[in-house]
């Protein structure tokens, strides 16, 4: 079997294709969440706490010297990324919770006990007759 044929069979398995679709959708969803945090959530939050832009929070570790740029730790961007993560994690949690709820509804209720077979009915009748005979004696 050629390597190309093996690779094609591997790539076309349902799991690999599903994973690829999930990664692509996840990347697009990440951009939406980043925009939500950066453009919708953080500006009002910054305004509420005094007109602060979180992206500008930074600590300069070393000033710029000539052609050498400054060494800056941008912890505001980190705070924003933490918000991104929390929103993505919450959205995934809610999606999984919804999927689990839908799957539980799809589960059929326990099947009713099957009707007794002819043999079971006959044996039950024999048992009942024997009980009656023992009670008469």
Curated annotation (Swiss-Prot):
Protein name (database record): Large-conductance mechanosensitive channel
Statement: the UniProt record of this protein carries the keyword Mitochondrion: no
Cross-referenced Pfam families: MscL
Annotated localization: Cell inner membrane
Membrane topology reported for the UniProt record: Multi-pass membrane protein
GO cellular component: plasma membrane
TM region positions: 10-30, 76-96
Highest taxon of source: Bacteria
Quaternary context: Homopentamer.
């Amino acid at each position: 079997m050629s390597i190309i044929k093996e690779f094609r069979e591997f790539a076309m398995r349902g799991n690999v294709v599903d994973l690829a679709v999930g990664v692509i959708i996840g990347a697009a969803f990440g951009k939406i969440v980043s925009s939500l945090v950066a453009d919708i959530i953080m500006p009002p939050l910054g305004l509420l706490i005094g007109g602060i832009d979180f992206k500008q929070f930074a600590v300069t570790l070393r000033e710029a010297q000539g052609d050498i740029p400054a060494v800056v730790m941008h912890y505001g961007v980190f705070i924003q990324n933490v918000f991104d993560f929390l929103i993505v994690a919450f959205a995934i949690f809610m999606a999984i919770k919804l999927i689990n709820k839908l799957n539980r509804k799809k589960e059929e209720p326990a099947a009713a006990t099957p009707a007794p077979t002819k043999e079971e009915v006959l044996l039950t009748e024999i048992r009942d007759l024997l009980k009656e005979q023992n009670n008469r004696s």
